[in-house]
Amino acid sequence: MRVVVIAIGRLKQGPERELAERYRERFDDLGRKLGFRGPEIHEIGESRARDAPTRIAEEAAAIAALIPDKAVLVTLDERGDSLDSAGFARKLGGWRDQSTAQAIFVIGGADGLSPELRRKAKLSVSFGAATWPHQMVRVMLLEQLYRAATILSGHPYHRA
């Protein structure tokens, strides 16, 4: 199963980018042995529109253009479900076992995701009630993808 992360905003050089790349590489290495490919990262520049509704709409159009019809769409949203790591791993493993071609994880911009994208999502995940910068959300998502792979493989990284 191909894993893709679509994120509004670009990670600049620095510790967040290095940490994100570390977890991306770890998932890629372990994930291949488990039937996963990726994660591919698609960065979309933030809209420069003057008002939030227009920014959200422009960003949603750019995101939607990257989502194939039969992909499982997962949004990262503060209103989403709070899953523990084992539950997240079960979801990811379940989609793989159902021969899902792609799982697309979407991280919105500062104004959030459009209601249409949120409605289309098979799952919406929250990393808690706090608002997180998109750079941190990307690192946390990539770490959880790697952690899910370790759980699915029986690797001792996850100690619960």
Curated annotation (Swiss-Prot):
Q: Which gene encodes it?
A: rlmH
Principal subcellular localization = cytoplasm
- For the protein in the UniProt heading, the enzyme class is transferase
UniProt cross-references to InterPro entries, sorted A to Z: Alpha/beta_knot_MTases (IPR029028), RlmH-like (IPR003742), tRNA_m1G_MTases_N (IPR029026)
Oligomeric state and interaction partners are given as:
Homodimer.
Could you tell me where this protein is found in the cell?
A: Cytoplasm
Q: Which family does it belong to?
A: Belongs to the RNA methyltransferase RlmH family.
The role this protein plays is: Specifically methylates the pseudouridine at position 1915 (m3Psi1915) in 23S rRNA.
User: Which positions are annotated as binding S-adenosyl-L-methionine?
Assistant: L76, G108
GO molecular function annotations of the record? rRNA (pseudouridine-N3-)-methyltransferase activity
What's this protein's name?
Ribosomal RNA large subunit methyltransferase H
Where does it sit, as one GO cellular component term?
cytoplasm
Keywords in alphabetical order: Cytoplasm, Methyltransferase, rRNA processing, S-adenosyl-L-methionine, Transferase
